[in-house]
A protein has these predicted regions:
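Structured, active/binding-site neighborhoods that engage oxygen-rich ligands
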Residues: 1-233
Length: 233
């Protein structure tokens, strides 16, 4: 993450305040300590996790859902990916729930099976529908106030585009909602419309495209999903 930030110091849409401090001014952050222990990256970078329960941990975890053969390993690595910065229990839970939903979706689990597992394992209420949330939802950058709503947008969708439209129109932290919803929807529907894919990859820095190509080659992602963009064939 530090390498990406150094190459792209101001991400499209910007980075969160605490994350910017973690990246560029790590000494200003208080090292948050809990039962998980220290991040494995602290000793070499001088950066410490800062106890965040923010939805950034869930927003960035999607790739973890594609790398591993078992749900247990997926959840374990999702926790590690979150704890580098977001080592609050809610931050870790949000990342694990998102990665678990993606793993289940790519392995052909039904929406109801995904709903039941996430509710039972992570305690999120997924029975409130998109129609319930749309008129009442507002800004919330916590995992506990974002991940359930994002999963709900997926559960109530008919295809990938519909899932994204629901997430964006819900309001609040809509880019994060769409990241979480879209990661699950792509794994489930296994296709992204060409028009959407072209607009997404167009502004990417070259390093992002190199990483995407590597992920396609090294995981089942490349043979499972149809990315409807000319660059991907």
């Amino acid at each position: 993450m530090v390498m990406f930030a150094e190459k792209c110091p101001c991400g499209m849409g910007g980075y969160g305040e605490s994350f910017v401090r973690w990246l560029f001014y790590p000494k200003e952050l208080y090292a948050y300590d809990d039962e998980l222990g220290a991040s494995p990256y602290e000793s070499t970078t001088g950066r410490h996790p800062y106890g965040s329960w923010g939805n950034g941990a869930a927003m960035r975890v999607s790739a973890v859902g594609w790398f591993f053969d078992t749900l247990e390993e997926t959840e374990r690595v999702a926790a590690i990916s979150a704890a580098i910065t977001h080592n609050h229990p809610e931050g870790i839970k949000g990342a694990q729930a998102t990665a678990a939903a993606i793993w289940m979706a790519r392995n052909g689990k039904t929406k109801e099976t995904i709903r039941e597992y996430i509710e039972k394992t992570y305690g999120y209420d997924l029975h409130k529908t998109y129609e319930y949330w749309h008129p009442v939802y507002g800004w919330d950058d916590s995992c506990q106030g974002t991940v359930p709503q994002a999963i709900t947008c997926f559960l109530g969708s008919s295809d990938f585009e519909d899932a994204i439209r629901k997430a964006v129109s819900l309001g609040g932290d809509s880019d994060t909602l769409a990241c979480i919803t879209g990661g699950i929807a792509e794994a489930y529907y296994k296709e992204i419309p060409r028009s959407i894919a072209e607009q997404v990859v167009k502004p990417f820095p070259k390093i992002f495209n190199k990483i995407l190509d590597a992920v396609r080659k090294e995981t089942v992602y490349g043979v499972t999903c149809k990315i409807a963009d000319k660059r991907f064939g």
